[in-house]
Swiss-Prot record:
Gene: mgrB
Subcellular location, record wording: Cell inner membrane
Keywords in alphabetical order: Cell inner membrane, Cell membrane, Membrane, Transmembrane, Transmembrane helix
The organism of origin for this protein: Escherichia coli O127:H6 (strain E2348/69 / EPEC)
InterPro entries to which the protein is assigned, alphabetical: MgrB
One of the protein's GO biological processes: negative regulation of phosphorelay signal transduction system
Keyword DNA repair part of the UniProt annotation: no
Classification of source organism: Bacteria, Pseudomonadati, Pseudomonadota, Gammaproteobacteria, Enterobacterales
A Gene Ontology cellular-component term: plasma membrane
Self-association state and partner proteins as the record states: May form homooligomers. Probably interacts with the periplasmic domain of PhoQ.
Function (record text): PhoP-regulated transcription is redox-sensitive, being activated when the periplasm becomes more reducing. MgrB acts between DsbA/DsbB and PhoP/PhoQ in this pathway. Represses PhoP/PhoQ signaling, possibly by binding to the periplasmic domain of PhoQ, altering its activity and that of downstream effector PhoP.
TM regions (residue ranges): 6-26
Name of the protein this chain belongs to: PhoP/PhoQ regulator MgrB
Coiled coil (UniProt feature): none
Family membership noted in the UniProt record: Belongs to the MgrB family.
Pfam families assigned to the protein according to its UniProt record, in alphabetical order: MgrB
Length: 47
């Protein structure tokens, strides 16, 4: 039962990371000033 809880936790964390990646890509496409630094870093991370 404990193993299932760990798997669920990992799945939720991965889903959140994917969601953040999508949000970052959207913001980068719109060229938001605040995200420009993050976008520069984001290009080096293979999403």
């Amino acid at each position: 039962m404990k193993k299932f809880r760990w798997v669920a936790l990992v799945v939720v964390v991965l889903a959140c990371l994917l969601l953040w990646a999508q949000v970052f890509n959207m913001m980068c496409d719109q060229d938001v000033q605040f995200f420009s630094g993050i976008c520069a870093i984001n290009q080096f991370i293979p999403w």
